[in-house]
Amino acid sequence: MSNKPTTPNLVDPKILFPAAKAAFVKLDPRQLVRNPVIFVTEAMAALVTLFFVLDVATGGGSRLFSGQIAAWLWFTVLFATFAEAVAEGRGKAQADFLRHTKSELSARKLVAPEGRETKEIPATMLKVGDLVLVQAGELIPGDGEVVEGVASVNESAITGESAPVIREAGGDRSAVTGGTEVLSDWVKVRITTAPGSTFVDRMIALIEGAQRQKTPNEIALSILLSGLTLIFLIAVVTLWGLASYSATVLSVTVLSALLVTLIPTTIGGLLSAIGIAGMDRLVRFNVIATSGRAVEAAGDVDTLLLDKTGTITFGNRMASDFLPVPGVTVEELADAALLASLADETPEGRSIVALATGEFGRGASQTGIDAVVPFTAETRLSGVDHRGRRLRKGAVDSVLRFAGLSDSKIPQEFRQAVDKVARTGGTPLAVADGNRLLGVVHLKDVVKPGIKERFSELRAMGIRTVMVTGDNPITAAAIASEAGVDDFLAEATPEDKLAYIRKEQNGGRLIAMCGDGTNDAPALAQADVGVAMQTGTQAAREAANMVDLDSSPTKLIEIVEIGKQLLMTRGSLTTFSIANDVAKYFAIIPALFVTTYPALGVLNIMGLASPQSAILSAVIFNALIIVALIPLALKGVRYRPVGAAALLRGNLLVYGLGGLVLPFAGIKLIDLAVSNLNLV
């Protein structure tokens, strides 16, 4: 399955219509009180509405003006709740699909642990420790561990990956997930999770946001926004007193409009949507985070611990070079190795064919092959008899034995080539034509293409990369140098991983790592961001705070980028929101006092038509900017792999300066429309 997320259509009626309905439900003050900025906005909208109703009843006041202010204040609140509802709605479809996979499941519970007699019960009645029997064509009724048997399992309902996986008792492939289907054979499963707390249940709750808790950064930002709101509330009350002293009459409608336009309603209205959208982006990468805290931690990560096999390298030994002995050309060696590998279906054999035909441009036909010699554990070599030639390749000692060469007859250059390959972490394969030694094929665990560039990007972001491997230090150093990692941990045991993580954390660093085995569980639990593979054990998945449904270790890099994008988006829109207040200040303050203090007219740098037009234009802009920024909040600020200082400069220029300039233009255009339409 692709790691790239699909970008949802933000104008999809299936998302917008339910979100519009949910936006009205979220107007409940008991829900809005969790967002102080929007709660104050709703309170002001209700207050202005009350005075508008009184004006209509008594026939006094500026009813058209106060009615429009009331309407746009309500729109401000609605647009904020709509942004959150749209963000939540994008995960509803996947949650509904997951809920469908677990509905009406039944289980065949074993009557006796050692027997095969079963009784059928609803899956919801299963308890932790129960043993169930699942055969081909049946759905696994709950999360558990395979204790007996081996089976092919279709996990597409959970991972989206159509290729079946093997689940068997013991080892790191024993964990199974409720709602997945057994395709062949049978397994005996011990239930490890109570109904309602299964992996699918947790996914549904996380996707829908039902259990979403505010992250530490969100709490800190909410406190900042609440503080700003309180400061502006005190300022507006003080302004009312000053206006009374100067005989300037300021209505409740005007003061309410002033307060709402000055408090940071833009980021206040989009804050929840940004957090939900960050987790949703992970879901679209097929990664489930247990909390928003984990996503934020990914954005602050300083060090990545990456397993060598599968993450940095392919994990299969592949041919990388031909090293002929004196008197043999590289073409002759390549031809012999190619012929000896034509019938070899192992990854190593196919890689020799690919190297000879690709990089060396050799070609060979299977015609003329008299016999094929397959690889066996006893002989440790393979090859062909071709037109009277006996071509063999394999382990060095096996090929030397086949060739019948004594130590004195082995070329020194051959020994040096074998030693060179071994020292650099590779595997030497000898090639012989009868009793004639031709040379060595260098097999090595090939570094994935493009991985070095990815590590360079991470380094530019200030993130250290550490390769973890069980290889000896010489081999580890060679691969680390080729891959471009900053450090490596050789001959690593689970205890070594845990000790390394603790050492880094004691130095004030945040650590991210991935793993799939039970032996990885302590390190996954200790890491600030622990990503477990869906194909891993139950212990690993429970210890981690993220689960990768594609089981792709390389995805840890994308997870870090998504975390950074979340933090950047929140910071950028906060900067934009606060910068907006400057333009609104120049729009409203002169309008309030220009009749009493004509000298304040010089502050009307936008040349707004009238005091009422200026106030109404600022309120309208304040509401519309929330709608305009919803796509950015959901999609996220564009991420570039550069250093923190460069990112800060760029975002301050775009969102700080943009937050200053855009409201001037926007309020002026709205003022022209308001005055031309005679709305005040």
UniProtKB/Swiss-Prot annotation:
Regarding the membrane, this protein is recorded as:
Multi-pass membrane protein
Q: Which family does it belong to?
A: Belongs to the cation transport ATPase (P-type) (TC 3.A.3) family. Type IA subfamily.
Q: Does the keyword Transmembrane helix apply?
A: yes
Q: Could you tell me the keywords of this UniProt record?
A: ATP-binding, Cell inner membrane, Cell membrane, Ion transport, Magnesium, Membrane, Metal-binding, Nucleotide-binding, Phosphoprotein, Plasmid, Potassium, Potassium transport, Translocase, Transmembrane, Transmembrane helix, Transport
Q: What is this protein called?
A: Potassium-transporting ATPase ATP-binding subunit
Taxonomic lineage:
Bacteria, Pseudomonadati, Pseudomonadota, Alphaproteobacteria, Hyphomicrobiales
Annotated binding of ATP, by residue: 344, 348, 375-382, 393
Q: Where are the transmembrane segments?
A: 37-57, 69-89, 223-243, 257-277, 586-606, 614-634, 652-672
* UniProt-annotated location(s): Cell inner membrane
